């Protein structure tokens, strides 16, 4: 079965059934309707923290711009591995006119063990420096080969500088100090490589992440990190920072919607990215219906503190309600008959950002979309495990039929302790799902389309009434 063809047909048919929403008044500077978002990388891509953030943003912000999200990350991968699977796993997903590629690789190429005290004691500084320099040259050569293969096969290739290795956090995991300095050098290599090719653009993830991480640790303590406890894999906070770097780099849409009402003149002064109807000024209350063209971006509790370091809500999550000409006092805001907040006349005159109000029905809907994006992330990561197992065992498994492959992995599974939870779960998933690989692949575009359906904005009734 041609899995890619089958999944594309499913995605297209489901996307065509999307309901009509408010007129969208903004667009992406990087994606177009019908694009494939092909994310290539190692476990940081495969595990999906930043891919989750990107997917959630684009589906909530531009729910009428259908993007086919494809996770092409593999745990443990490096430049050599990407080159090996280029023809079989990567390029078949790309389309020269309809795809935007993302490439981030380097964490494993940096060979973190080179920065351990044990390695330094064993080799001595001169020999170790020579080894690191040689390895850097290998990375430059292979990264160039990868870029030269992908760039001609996609409309745009976005090259990330490698995400940070947290070498400044005071946490239990052994610190291979110097790894992130090497990743910075890798980033310079990437930028130099990109200069030569017109359709390759760079996002300096490492700079943004280490800047925010440094501010976080300076203000909240060295035991804080936007990376996971292993110093390598970003959790949602890290993915959130990566999203912010992406949005800044491409000047992506800032607004959910804007509504400006002049209460004194009883007029709608402005509406952006929303359709306003049934505006009334009766019995001391202001009421109207709003159908927005977007949803607010739902920020996980674990990452809310990061807004102070990035100003994400101010810059990229603006759902503004501004009402001037009100009498001084306090006002209750109701949406669909439920109180969602209390604001002063001054706050309303200045404009309140409802995207940060977790009580609104729009935010609740966005949280539902996010949960579905998490489900997509999990399914994609599990599916990528099948490819990862076969890539890591290719010298043996390439010679086997499907039953032989399953038997081989079953032996690996039986030898793997549950304490090694990642490989235990990966082998288990492989054994249970290898014969259903096509079905598992087909589930992803179906879910992708379902998420877009869940993200279609709904009309809501607003009512503002003076309370004191």
Regions found by a protein language model. Name each.
Residues 1-6:
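Positively charged n-region of N-terminal signal peptides that target proteins for export
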Residues 25-39:
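Membrane/wall-proximal cationic-aromatic binding patches
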Residues 20-24:
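Boundary at the C-terminal end of the N-terminal hydrophobic targeting segment
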Residues 35-49, 75-79, 110:
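Catalytic nucleophile-elbow at a beta strand-turn-alpha helix junction centered on a G-D-S/GDSL motif
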Residues 39-40, 71, 159:
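A structural signal for the hydrophobic beta-strands that form the central parallel beta-sheet
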Residues 7-17:
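Bacterial N-terminal signal peptides
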Residues 31-32, 52-68, 77-468:
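Alpha-helical cap/lid subdomain in secreted, periplasmic
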Residues 10, 36, 224-226:
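Short, functionally important structural connectors and interaction interfaces within domains
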């Amino acid at each position: 079965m041609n899995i890619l063809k089958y999944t594309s047909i499913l995605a297209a048919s489901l996307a065509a059934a999307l309901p009509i929403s408010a007129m969208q008044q903004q667009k992406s500077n990087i994606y177009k309707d019908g694009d494939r978002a092909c994310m290539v990388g190692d476990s940081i891509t495969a595990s999906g923290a930043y891919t989750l953030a990107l997917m959630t943003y684009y589906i909530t912000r531009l729910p009428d711009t259908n993007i086919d999200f494809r996770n092409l990350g593999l745990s443990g991968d490096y430049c050599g591995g990407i080159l090996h699977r280029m023809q079989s796993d990567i390029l078949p997903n790309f389309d020269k006119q309809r795809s935007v590629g993302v490439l981030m690789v380097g964490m494993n190429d940096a060979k973190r063990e080179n920065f351990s005290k044990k390695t330094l004691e064993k080799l001595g500084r001169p020999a170790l420096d020579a080894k690191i320099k040689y390895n850097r040259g290998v990375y430059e050569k292979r990264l160039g080969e990868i870029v030269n293969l992908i760039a001609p096969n996609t409309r745009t290739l976005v090259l990330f500088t490698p995400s940070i290795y947290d070498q400044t956090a005071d946490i239990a995991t052994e610190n291979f100090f110097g790894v992130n300095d090497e990743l910075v050098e890798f980033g310079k290599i990437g930028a130099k490589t990109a200069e030569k090719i017109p359709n390759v653009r760079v996002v300096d993830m490492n700079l943004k992440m280490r800047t925010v991480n440094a501010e976080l640790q300076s203000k909240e303590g060295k035991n804080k990190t936007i990376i996971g406890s292993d110093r390598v894999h970003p959790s949602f906070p890290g993915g959130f920072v990566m999203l912010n770097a992406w949005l800044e780099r491409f000047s992506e849409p800032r607004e959910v919607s804007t509504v400006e009402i002049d209460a004194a003149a009883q007029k709608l002064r402005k509406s952006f990215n929303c359709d306003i109807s049934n505006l009334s000024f009766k019995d001391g209350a202001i009421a109207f219906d709003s159908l927005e063209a977007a949803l607010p971006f739902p920020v996980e509790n674990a990452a809310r503190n990061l807004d102070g370091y990035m100003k994400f809500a101010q810059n990229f999550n603006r759902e503004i309600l501004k009402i001037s000409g009100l009498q001084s006092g306090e006002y209750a805001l109701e949406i669909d008959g439920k109180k969602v907040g209390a604001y002063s006349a001054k706050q309303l005159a200045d404009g309140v950002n409802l995207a940060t109000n977790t009580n609104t029905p729009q935010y609740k809907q966005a949280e539902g979309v996010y949960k579905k994006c998490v489900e997509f992330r999990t399914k994609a990561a599990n599916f990528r495990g099948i490819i990862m197992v076969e890539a890591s065992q290719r010298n043996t498994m390439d010679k086997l039929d499907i039953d032989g492959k399953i038997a081989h992995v079953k032996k690996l599974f039986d030898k793997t302790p549950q304490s090694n939870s990642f490989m235990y779960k990966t082998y288990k998933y492989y054994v249970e799902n290898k014969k259903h690989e096509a079905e598992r692949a087909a589930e992803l575009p179906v879910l992708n389309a379902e998420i877009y359906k869940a993200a279609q904005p709904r009309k809501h009734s607003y009512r503002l009434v003076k309370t004191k």
